[in-house]
Amino acid sequence: MNINEDSLQKIAELSRLKIRSEEKEATLQDFNKILEYVDQIKGLDVSSIKDDEIYLHHENAIRPDLAGKHLSREEIESFAPSFQNGYFVVPKVIET
């Protein structure tokens, strides 16, 4: 399966991306490489793998949620260029 320029344009429109004309060829090549890889994966013989075997040896890779040392208010204040009444002071972003 290959993506042509028309398909790339449709994908860009659907995903609200703007692909500059000088990027189109490289983007097409990248998409097509990804699709070739997906085709390789689709071609693998996985008939010998049972569905439930995938999950049998799975261990939780997430570390335990343990409380640790925390920073004091003074330490936190020292990181900020401006800190007032217990809050970080930042430049105004939204005009009202």
UniProtKB/Swiss-Prot annotation:
Entry EC number(s): 6.3.5.-
Keyword flag ATP-binding: yes
InterPro entries from the UniProt entry: Asp/Glu-ADT_sf_sub_c, GatC
Reactions this protein catalyses: L-glutamyl-tRNA(Gln) + L-glutamine + ATP + H2O = L-glutaminyl-tRNA(Gln) + L-glutamate + ADP + phosphate + H(+); L-aspartyl-tRNA(Asn) + L-glutamine + ATP + H2O = L-asparaginyl-tRNA(Asn) + L-glutamate + ADP + phosphate + 2 H(+)
Alphabetically ordered keywords of this record: ATP-binding, Ligase, Nucleotide-binding, Protein biosynthesis
Keyword Magnesium: no
GO biological process per UniProt: glutaminyl-tRNAGln biosynthesis via transamidation; regulation of translational fidelity; translation
First-tier enzyme category under EC: ligase
Domain of life of the native organism: Bacteria
One GO MF term attached to the UniProt entry: ATP binding
Subunit structure: Heterotrimer of A, B and C subunits.
Family: Belongs to the GatC family.
Physiological role: Allows the formation of correctly charged Asn-tRNA(Asn) or Gln-tRNA(Gln) through the transamidation of misacylated Asp-tRNA(Asn) or Glu-tRNA(Gln) in organisms which lack either or both of asparaginyl-tRNA or glutaminyl-tRNA synthetases. The reaction takes place in the presence of glutamine and ATP through an activated phospho-Asp-tRNA(Asn) or phospho-Glu-tRNA(Gln).
Name this polypeptide is given: Aspartyl/glutamyl-tRNA(Asn/Gln) amidotransferase subunit C
Organism: Leptospira interrogans serogroup Icterohaemorrhagiae serovar Lai (strain 56601)
